[in-house]
Amino acid sequence: MARKRKPPSSQGDPRRYDPDFQGPTAKRTCTDVLCCLIFLLFILGYVLLGLLAWAHGDPRKMAYPTDSQGHFCGQKGTPNENKTVLFYFNIFRCTSPSMMLRLQCSTTQICVSRCPERFLTYLDMQFLNKEDKNYWEYYRQFCKAKAKPVETLRDLLISGDCPLAVYPSRPFLQRCIPDLSALNGTWTPGSRMKFEDGSGQTRTMLEFREAANGISDLINARTIGLKLLEDYATSWKWILIGLTVAMALSWTFLILLRFTAGFLFWFFIFGVLGIIGYGIWYCFLEYSSIQQRPQSTFWMYGFGIQRRVNMFFHLKETWFSMMIILSAIEIIIIIVLIFLRTRIQVAIILLQEGSKAISYLPSALIYPVLTFILLSICISYWAVTAVFLATSGVPIFKVMVPAGQCIYEDETCDPEIFPYTNIPKDCPGASCNFAFYGGRSMYHNYILTFQVYNLFAFLWLINFVIALGQCALAGAFASYYWAMKKPDDIPPYPLFTAFGRAVRYHTGSLAFGSLILASVQMFKVIVEYLDRRLKKAQNSAAQFLHCCLQCCFWCLEKMVKFLNRNAYIMIALYGKNFCESTRDAFYLLMRNILKVTVTDEVTYFVLLLGKVLVSGIVGVLAFLLFTERLQIIVDGPTTLNYYWVPFLTLVFGSYMIAHGFFSVYSMCVETIFICFLEDLERNEGSPSRPYFVTPALMNILLEQGKIKKQ
């Protein structure tokens, strides 16, 4: 009888014993060449896009305010060099609903050297000017350059050369904002409660505040940006010191893991629980303190987010909410520890094995610096290109009508010939104002497409840099594992060799994997963009769909990242293309699914606690410093607008630094584990086919009952 063939397994066939296999394959060929060529062409196109944006863009358009003629205020070498402030002819038009759509007030705007200091209408100026000519000299500085005195208000409305009235204002981010002074709780300009705006209409303080808020909403982001820059300029030395402390702590923890993994594991746990407990205690103190004050709950309103942020930390609800959130995190960590208590010993042994590998390959701890440099280059290039693309083009002028009832509204116009057209006659009050920077050329028509290209290229390059690091580290740690006599059998310069192999042979495969991940992330960005566009509609079905898509893409991204990491390990080991490596890694994990659940969950959780502990220690020190509670340091920053800005920067920066160091550790543990699974399938522990795994790791897994001898 013929012998029946065994059907192929749905989980793939186990590895067979190969006496010649001694770690990462030396003889390789280039993989995924087509994807490599596409990737290189894509980078070339990205470079050309950057040069094109550099040639057409002008970042000054974001730094200087622009008048209605499209000229910069305060720019050196121009007639507006000494006119650094933007003045609005009719600030009440900034309350128009269409203003937020155009991001521009539908009123004439000119550059002036100073803001008005008194309330004065044009008619009052005419009357007073008969006795004192200085009134016209004062008023004309808020008019157009060619303005001349007119006799009637009708002539003034037709010419549009001067505002109907000027109000006491103060410069705010190079804009003249009405000076609203609080007198006995009532908002008043100067000392008037109601007044005429020069056109016969009576205005109230509420209208004034709405107009000021309208302008504030337009420039709010730039306001916060400047204040943030000021805070960074004040505290940058302390931020660098804090990041250095985070780097030293991360390095110290990695070294200590080699000798005291068990002790450090419990130190991570109790350290994180202690820091969160301190946060709960501090939030409770602030909550109790504010609760004893009268009027601790109030409605927040004012000029943009600056006022709201300042009030935010004076609300008892703020501290109560943060206390609840921290308490929930504390409880979740304790529950997770209870469920994972039986697997902690496995994680400790894996951490010790990872520490041994890193001690033999100390250059692995320096590799995050290279990753940081490459990521910084990618982020900087993306940001600069985005700014230059956003500021490309020439000034575009459009017809703006305050009433919004004109057939010519939003049509392009030329400010030089606009007064001689029929538009001012057909639409009284219409003006030809600067709207935005753009153009009608092919380049300007594709600005949005270029921005999308810029974002996708950024995501692709970021993921490629991370993939390159993972593949290089995997190759180095695989060389360590498959050395029978450590460190004698470890090849020289394993990290440098693995990095060279990855770049020379597997650029296409790494680009392929990073392309898949970048595509998923791009879809997430598109979903978020659509959600922001649909939020105002308050459509329940659309919101439900968004939540479902967001959840699906989040799960998909996590799954792709997990498969990519293991695929890069297989690429580093065998040098196959991305699809074959992904298939082999997936089958290997599926054949050993129980062992995967033992290691990954606990090990990653321990490393996460280490990152949180590093950022938490630096965060507590930063909080004490920036709130002047650290009495040891007397020269700390004391003039910060928002102390939480450098504080959050330090916490986030410390976490990213710790993530950079601990990601090396994570890749080390994952590579050792994949190699361990390969080792179990290739060998049997006999003298002729010995295991490469260390006895400590083998014994702990045997004790857990996860490995059964063949």
From Swiss-Prot:
Output this protein's name: Choline transporter-like protein 5
| Region feature (Disordered) | 1-21
Q: Which residues lie on this side of the membrane: Extracellular?
A: 54-236, 282-319, 367-368, 476-509, 626-643
Which residues are sugar-modified?
82, 184
Q: Which residue ranges are assigned to the Cytoplasmic compartment in the record's topology?
A: 1-32, 258-260, 341-345, 390-454, 531-604, 665-710
List the coiled-coil residues.
Answer: none
Which sequence ranges are marked TM in the entry? 33-53, 237-257, 261-281, 320-340, 346-366, 369-389, 455-475, 510-530, 605-625, 644-664
Domain of life according to the entry:
Eukaryota
Keywords for the protein's UniProt record, in alphabetical order: Antiport, Cell membrane, Glycoprotein, Membrane, Transmembrane, Transmembrane helix, Transport
Subcellular localization:
Cell membrane
Q: What does this protein do?
A: Choline/H+ antiporter.
Name the encoding gene, please. Answer: Slc44a5
Any one Gene Ontology biological process term? choline transport
Q: What's its membrane topology?
A: Multi-pass membrane protein
Which family does the UniProt entry place this protein in?
Belongs to the CTL (choline transporter-like) family.
**In the record, what terms sit under GO molecular function?**
antiporter activity; choline transmembrane transporter activity
GO CC annotation: plasma membrane
Q: Which reaction(s) are listed as its catalytic activity?
A: choline(out) + n H(+)(in) = choline(in) + n H(+)(out)
